[in-house]
Amino acid sequence: MSNSAPARQYLNEKVTPVLLEGMKILARDRPENPLQFLGQFLLDANANQQKQKEIVNQPEPQQETPKADADMSTPTMAEQVQTSFSNPASTPLTQTSSPSSNPGKNSAS
């Protein structure tokens, strides 16, 4: 009986879910040739399962590379912004744009 437990577990994990799904469709649709229908269903389910495994096992460096490039460009953008704020030429622009920094010019206008 010890051999039946691993066999039962294998069937319950690998075969039963797909077979039950096919049997439900078979009972619902009642095709003219049920065995041919069920056989084709199982073949199709196996093909779909193989495609899913291939998709999951594919390496994804093409998708990760743009993300890495985008992450690398973020500090460069931050450095550019920081450089523009620390540039002495931009300081007068921020001072003149503030109404409280030069009240005499605002009242004359």
Curated annotation (Swiss-Prot):
Taxonomic superkingdom: Eukaryota
Biased composition (Polar residues): 73-87
Chain spans, region Disordered: 49-109
Biased composition (Low complexity): 88-101
Main location: nucleus
Gene Ontology BP terms: transcription initiation-coupled chromatin remodeling
Annotated keywords: Nucleus
GO cellular component, one term: chromatin
Cellular location(s): Nucleus
Pfam families named among the record's database cross-references: Dpy-30
Function text: The COMPASS (Set1C) complex specifically mono-, di- and trimethylates histone H3 to form H3K4me1/2/3, which subsequently activates gene expression by regulating transcription elongation and plays a role in telomere length maintenance.
Subunit structure: Component of the COMPASS (Set1C) complex composed of ash2, sdc1, set1, shg1, spp1, swd1, swd2 and swd3. Component of the Lid2 complex composed of ash2, jmj3, lid2, sdc1 and snt2.
Protein family membership: Belongs to the dpy-30 family.
Protein name: Set1 complex component sdc1
Organism from which the protein derives: Schizosaccharomyces pombe (strain 972 / ATCC 24843) (Fission yeast)
Gene name of the record: sdc1
